[in-house]
């Protein structure tokens, strides 16, 4: 999962929690915690899995409406997704709904 330097890294053995990431976070402050695949590509271009800067570019070009901040990052490896489905997923969905978000972009690792 993608997180900001200073935040607690994701548990690479499986983590159903999430991290809030402000859209204006500098690229050099983003980190990746994952051991189930080669993260070199993510280190080179974090937008390949968390398209926050690309979304801001689309917003600036007028192709999408206002981008929501913060964005939410989840771990890609969750062997038991029950807590994600029953607790953290609905929690984030509720926050997005409260903020009036019309659509989401989901990236995978």
Regions found by a protein language model. Give the residues of each.
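An N-terminal assembly and electron-transfer interface module characteristic of large anaerobic redox
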Residues: 1-109
């Amino acid at each position: 999962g993608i997180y900001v330097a200073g935040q607690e890294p994701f548990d690479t053995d499986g983590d159903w929690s999430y991290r809030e990431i402000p859209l204006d976070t500098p690229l050099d402050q983003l980190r990746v915690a994952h051991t189930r695949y080669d993260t070199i590509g993510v280190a080179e271009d974090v937008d390949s899995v968390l398209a926050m800067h690309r979304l801001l570019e689309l917003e600036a070009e007028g192709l999408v409406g206002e981008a929501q901040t913060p964005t939410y990052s989840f771990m890609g490896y969750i062997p038991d997704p029950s807590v994600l489905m029953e607790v953290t997923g609905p929690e984030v969905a509720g926050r997005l709904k409260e903020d009036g978000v019309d659509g989401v972009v989901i990236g995978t690792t």
